[in-house]
Amino acid sequence: MTARHAEIVGAGLAGLTTAAVLAGRGWSVRVHERGEELREIGAGIYMWENALRALTAIGAFDLIATAGENVADTQLLDHRHRLLQRQWLRGARLYTVLRSDLHQALRTVAVAAGVQIETGSEVVAARPGGMIELRDGSMLSADLVVGADGVGSRVRESLGLTRSVVDLKDGCGRHLIERTADDPVGTTFEEWNGGRRLGVVPCAAGWTYIFLCCPENDQAGIRQDPFEPAAWLETFPHYASQLRRIPRDGPGRWARFFDVTARSWCAGRVALIGDAAHAMSPNLGQAACVAMANAVALGEVLDGRAVEDALPRWERSERPITDRVQRYSRIYGWVGTHWPPSLLDVRSSMVSALARSKRLQRRINCGAEYFPVLAQ
C-alpha cells in the first residue's frame, strides 16, 4: 500500500511536531520553511503535562528531560512582593527548556522518522483539494496539507478561514541570562506591579529565562532593544541581579501578543495547526503545548479514515479545549496587564482568594491536564 503524503507549511514547533507524528504513523512528509535556515525565535518555554505527553508520543521526551529544568514550584507575587500563589497545579509535571533546544529535539525526531525539510521554500497559498502553491508558481499535491505558518498564515488567508486576528494591546520581551547563584533552581517566579509583569525562569544548564511583559502604551517598558534596565529596576527592585545581567544588545525584543480565531481549522484536505489556527498570548504557558497535543490528535484521527472525513472530526474533538485555553489566557493577561492602577490591592486580594481553589486552578489551566481523547 502506498504511503499517504503530507505537505506541511512551516517548520516551527507545531509544524515539526505534526511532521514527526505523521511520519511515525507511516506517512511520507515534506516540510516547507521559507527561511534559508531552521531556527526558533525566543528564549525559554514551558512544557506542561500535555506537551510532555506529546513529546513522549513522538520519542522526544528524553531529549527535553535531559536539556531542560524540572520545575517543582511556581510562585506568583504582587506589587508589594507578597506571595499570592504557589505550586500552580500541584503535582503536575512541568519542564522549562530553551526554545532552541526544543526546536532541535523536534527536528531530530522528525528527520529520524524520515521527514524531508525544505528550507528557502516559500508557500504562498493552498487549495482545499490538497494543493500548495510555491512562490515560483509551481504547485505540489498531497493527501494532506497542514498550515503551520503562524499568525499571518498564508494558508489560512488563501482559504478564507480567518475570522479574526486581534491585537491584544500588550506584549513581552524575552531574554536569556547566564545563570548565577542568585537565580532560582527548580522554581519559577512571576511578579506583577501595575501593568508590568516580570518572570524569572530557570530553563537549562547555565541559563535563566527572563520575560518582561507590559501594555503597548508603556513606552519605557516596550523599549527592550537595546535593553535599558532602569525602568524595570524601578518597578522590580528585588530582581536587580537578573535585570542587570540582561544583555544590552542581545536578541531579546518586545513583541506583541495576538489572538487568532479561524472560521474552521480545516477545508477539504487542508488543516491549520498552532498559531495559524489559534494563536494566543503565552500567559498560561500553553500556546505551543496545545498545538503539540493537537498534532498527536491529528495523527490519531487520520488513521484508517479519509482525510476529508477525519479533519472535521479532529476539530470537533480538540477545538473546544483549545478555545477555552485561549480565552483564559486572554483573561489572565487582562488582569495582569490592563488592571486599573488604583485597584492593585483589590487585584491581589482577588487573585490570592481565587488561587486557593483547586477547582478553579484546574479550570483555568485546563489545557495542561488534558490530552486528546482521540489519542487515548
What are these regions (language model features)?
Residues 1-4, 66, 81-82, 284-285, ...:
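C-terminal helical "tail/cap" subdomain of flavin- and related membrane-associated enzymes
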Residues 2-6, 23, 48-159, 163-180, ...:
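Conserved N-terminal helical subregion
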Residues 8-24, 32-35, 147, 251-335:
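Conserved mid-domain beta->alpha element of the FAD-binding
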Residues 29:
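Short beta-strand element of Class I
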Residues 36-54:
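Conserved N-terminal glycine-rich FAD pyrophosphate-binding loop of Rossmann-like flavoproteins
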Residues 153, 172-174, 196-199, 277-278:
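Histidine-centered metal-chelating micro-motifs
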Residues 187-219, 236:
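Active-site substrate-recognition segment that forms the wall
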Residues 221-254, 315-316, 320:
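Flavin-binding catalytic cores
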